[in-house]
Amino acid sequence: MSNKFEILMNQLDMPLEMRNSEAFLNAEIEKVLVHKVSRVWEFHFSFANILPIEIFRELQKRLAQEFSKTGNQAVFEIHCQAPQVSDELLQAYYQLAFEEGPCASHGFKSLYQDLRVHLDGDKLLIEGASTIDTEHFRKNHLPNLSQQLVKYGFPQLTCLVQHSDELTQQQAENFQAENDKIVQAANEEALKAMESLQQMAPPPEEKPAYDFQARKAAAKPKLDKAEITPMIEVQTEENRLVFEGMVFDLEQKVTRTGRVLLNFKMTDYTSSFSLQKWMKNEEEAKKFDMIKKGAWLRVRGNVEMNNFTRDLTMNVQDVQAVTHYERKDLMPEGQKRVEFHAHTNMSTMDALPEVEEIVATAAKWGHKAVAITDHGNVQSFPHGYKAAKKAGIQLIYGMEANIVEDRVPIVYNEVDMELSDATYVVFDVETTGLSAVYNDLIQVAASKMHKGNIIAEFDEFINPGHPLSAFTTDLTGITDEHVRNAKPLEQVLKEFQEFCQDSVLVAHNATFDVGFMNVNYERHGLPKIIQPVIDTLEFARNLYPEYKRHGLGPLTKRFQIALEHHHMANYDAEATGRLLFIFIKDVAEKHGVTNLKDLNTDLVDENSYKKARVKHATIYVKNQTGLKNIFKLVSLSNTKYFEGVPRIPRTVLDAHREGLILGSACSEGEVYDAVVSQGVDAAVEVAKYYDFIEVMPPAIYEPLIAKEQIKDQEELQTIIRNLIEVGDRLGKPVLATGNVHYIEPEEEIYREIIVRSLGQGAMINRTIGHGENAQPAPLPKAHFRTTNEMLDEFAFLGEDLAKKLVITNPNQLAETFEPVEVVKGDLYTPFIDKAEETVAELTYQKAFEIYGNPLPDIVDLRIEKELTSILGNGFAVIYLASQMLVQRSNERGYLVGSRGSVGSSFVATMIGITEVNPLSPHYVCGKCQYSEFITDGSYGSGFDMPDKDCPECGHKLSKNGQDIPFETFLGFDGDKVPDIDLNFSGEDQPSAHLDVRDIFGSEYAFRAGTVGTVAAKTAYGFVKGYERDYGKFYRDAEVERLAQGAAGVKRTTGQHPGGIVVIPNYMDVYDFTPVQYPADDVTAEWQTTHFNFHDIDENVLKLDVLGHDDPTMIRKLQDLSGIDPNDIPMDDAGVMALFSGTDILGVTQEQIGTPTGMLGIPEFGTNFVRGMVDETHPTTFAELLQLSGLSHGTDVWLGNAQDLIKQGIADLSTVIGCRDDIMVYLMHKGLDPKMAFTIMERVRKGLWLKISEEERNGYIAAMKENNVPEWYIESCGKIKYMFPKAHAAAYVMMALRVAYFKVHHPIYYYCAYFSIRAKAFDIKTMSGGLDAVKRRMSEIAEKRKNNEASNVEIDLYTTLEIVNEMLERGFKFGKLDLYKSHATEFLIEGDTLIPPFSAMDGLGDNVARQVVRAREEGEFLSKTELRKRGGLSSTLVEKMDDMGILGNMPEDNQLSLFDEFF
């Protein structure tokens, strides 16, 4: 027995005979795992053999008893060195496994616990009678049985269940004997009963006719009176259970045979369950349409283990919709409350409900108004504004702000006095809590110091008149023994005042110590402190701002001052005094401050607000002026004054207080703090700053009792009464507010999961208790309360006062708020002088240049139509701004690609915003402006028309036109705000962003803000973390339910990758939104809109200045080749050949592993689109547009166009590919343009099956009348989303330019591809030749097949596909060259590519550039020099050496003896 195990046995007081038995002869404790949060101690024991069952049970019992004394749990596992197993021992442990296993059902245990077990080699045979359901047992117990036995020390056994003839016979005999007894007893009872009945029987009555239908109805299962089983109680398979709960997830599947399976999940809020219901067909499924998300159902069925999900699932037999109890506000109309303190999911990682839920709940309960008060932000305002208008109730806009003092003083009661001459009393107090009003002084200690020397000391304990709590003793080290015979408080106070005469008082965090002393002085009729007081906490913060922590502990450690017993006043006081004289010396040397009166003026930093204690206050918008002011406050607090949290200095709040109303907030507010720490009189002075006082239900404050900040419920009620008194004294309304963080009480767990995910570093998760018993304090019950629930909370105040606080005062205050416009109703574009004239002039100028003057009618009418919409709706400035950005990027040498539908606008084409021409396919002569338009739909793209010479002058005609209607951009009436998305080169994007600032001004240009919420996968992780940290176990359905509840809460903010919001220069940003930094990064170059940009995108101009690889690639290819990309034809035969085979590349499909030449071609190079190309073999530009649309749409290709093409019903050119095709096709068929447009809009948004049947049938009838085929109509019904044709055209044009170089200038193409597009490299493989490349590709392919490939390997496979193709085409990869390789780009050397340094794994761009700079300074003479000058790590140098890059380079450049001789 090891020493550790022996100590444990003594601690457990194990019986001596067991302790000395052979079982513990070689016993050891292998390890102990302590799970602090769940308070579980996990022992791992090692024994020579399996313990006798009675010793095991005794060890288990004593461990559990011993650890439960401290609130912990003990579990253990056993490892046996040479286990010897007998059948008798095995039988005993088999029964123990049942007792401790998860099979909770009594019926299950009674059936299987007493089966006979024995060993056969390494197999555990379990035998039972033939009546035993071995399959049921195998599924429900075997998986756990083997695992349980291993924990007991048994070896890993294979468990088998089988029937035994012997046991079957024995069971039959026992059953017969028992049955004979039962029958005999029953017969005897029956005879007695018959005799009694015969004596009492009335005359026989005539039997009613047999009613089959009535009997059948009566036999139908009824669930109304069925016993409902809580889901939490079901841990194993059971039959005929009834659940009642809410459906929170639903999926319907139809099998190939037509059967319908409904998989759904329900919760009863004790747990959650997976359920499934099979139905014969979809017709039968309609009978169960009550199964839908949000529905409350009562269901009956059998619970079985699902072999696929490996979780218990109910196979549902009966379903009944039930009415679920909903909380209602039971007070009559006119007597309902108004909630003035509610948080939405925009309170970062703190609250759950969307603002729409809060508004809807208030409206449902008949409340006339509700306020929202998120922490430090107003991001729920826009959605709240729309929700309140829809619900028809008043929304009061507010926030819970963090208020700080601008400059926190170091000295109070300052006087003119030299610091070096003063006498100081450095003191500290110990108390039973933080409240000077409700807690007691238990120690006052001080050191009187002069010139750095202690000249007198004061140290007195004080008897509080009651036993000290464990918390106080743990924290301070002061026990009841210390204070039992101490002096009375009043005597200590008088003696201390005398001790302090003619001295400067000093304390660390002096406001607490001085506040405590003053309250006690006043209570005993003694004068308050009037002499100077120095706060060493603020002294340190201002003197050493570079330190992260300024607590007494960290400071004494930093300055090497002894602090033996922190939180005992005498030790703390002496340590503080030692620090004081260090500070006095440093402040004189660093800042020249030597006088007490100069500390505040010369040392207190203007940024001292950053360290000031934050106090909460609720700020509400009273009118439109207040809205703008709260926007300014939010902006300043999130930018200029942000420090950890958004802070509002008091003077800043004062400067912007017009139109705002201030409430005193929660227990983190200064009014509450003053009431608790200083008393009502002091709180009255503080409360003068506020417009109303908030009190909250006792349940909201109850966690403070757990934290021992409040003694009990009685003291809590006194605090609430005192808060009410503060308001009454000042004549300010007192409002009962709920501090709402979720709607329903059962949603508390979701907030618990979110908050605990922040970890113990978050203030809200600070633990109470010490050591293993430390746990986060409970969270308050913060659901949205009805009026009657709120009145119940405040019933202790009496009915009249409770109604005043809950109903009267909130309603009266709500009436003082004016309506405000949070979101503007119009678009406000910036002003650019003569924008309309410029757009029109540029348009016609370019049109005349191309098409001549006068313009062809088709061109003239299109321009007139577009300009009428653009200029008439104020969109000219949007067009002109985009044109200016594109022009500037073009001037820097980059093409700009368009996205979205802007290519539908011919004006955009003419002024250079897009290169997509949306006119009908046409010819035009570049010499004489002759033009010819094809308007019959015979060509899908002008690029597909045959070449033709000009009939007027013989010059070769240009071909263009994609046949895209303008309506798809600005709507049928041309009044939809244009959304112009532009793809700039990623290299040029930062310059383009700065162009926006340059054009409009930095005070008017902001990055488009985004709000990041907790995603479903993240929420799942939070739930699993909570499960782990707090010792929970949830089945899969419950994890999913909890994750759904926790998802959607704001987690961070960010910025759109290219979106820039432009504020009109005749307004300011606060007319629309506050501003902030993305993700609270105050070092960011750009500020963002505080609101999610979608919330204001119809009010201000948003430019999408996006970064993309295509323009960068084109620029690179142009630089390499000198070819102008605008000269590349869109109908090059060689390029089109790529889409039908590999011959044009000079390779076979076997060589490159794909039947076409699509590898590395933008838009067409993914596996998905390559598969589409293989199936369709496009031959025209129009068909490539179709492919682009099909690949980007949802339910456009799969299960739709793909099937139509396979079945020969349609071909690639006729299926629906892009959204615009629908309108154009239907117009060509003869439909009215307005109807064609409307049908397109319904289909592209996936609304075809969601609109009314009447509307849809009207469209279908019109389509059929115009000979639109049936398959086309059915195809429309399947579509969920469609890609704009203009977007497809822009992408395809870029793709074909890249493909042109792949066909005709391959080395340039591969150089550009690897420099710009490739994401992962393996230089050793790439330079190793074809065999090495193909071998590595095979390795990764095998991994991908088994889902074992990493993301990097998947990216590398894509790179190697292109490498393989390049090598097969006869080009080569060189090795990295220390003196040739570029930092980040591949270089061409004949038919060989030289890789850059950045392609080497682990070598970043910055280090690569450093290597290039270093080599320009001179040759590297050694590896040591390469490391130092090139900034390379030893690992990277070793890699270079392994790859042969360094040749024979020596380790260092010191000459050896031999070097000198030779």
From Swiss-Prot:
User: What are the EC numbers?
Assistant: 2.7.7.7
Per UniProt, the keywords (alphabetical) are: Cytoplasm, DNA replication, DNA-directed DNA polymerase, Exonuclease, Hydrolase, Nuclease, Nucleotidyltransferase, Transferase
Pfam families in the record: DNA_pol3_a_NI, DNA_pol3_a_NII, DNA_pol3_alpha, DNA_pol3_finger, HHH_6, PHP, RNase_T, tRNA_anti-codon
Q: Where in the cell is it found?
A: Cytoplasm
Q: Gene Ontology terms, cellular component aspect?
A: cytoplasm
A GO BP annotation: DNA-templated DNA replication
Output the SUPFAM superfamilies linked to this UniProt entry.
Nucleic acid-binding proteins, PHP domain-like, Ribonuclease H-like
Q: Catalytic activity annotated for this protein?
A: DNA(n) + a 2'-deoxyribonucleoside 5'-triphosphate = DNA(n+1) + diphosphate
- The superkingdom of the source organism is Bacteria
Question: What sequence ranges are listed for the domain Exonuclease?
Answer: 424-580
Output the Gene Ontology terms for molecular function: 3'-5' exonuclease activity; DNA binding; DNA-directed DNA polymerase activity
Q: What does this protein do?
A: Required for replicative DNA synthesis. This DNA polymerase also exhibits 3' to 5' exonuclease activity.
Similarity section: Belongs to the DNA polymerase type-C family. PolC subfamily.
Q: Which HAMAP family match?
A: DNApol_PolC
Protein name listed in UniProt? DNA polymerase III PolC-type
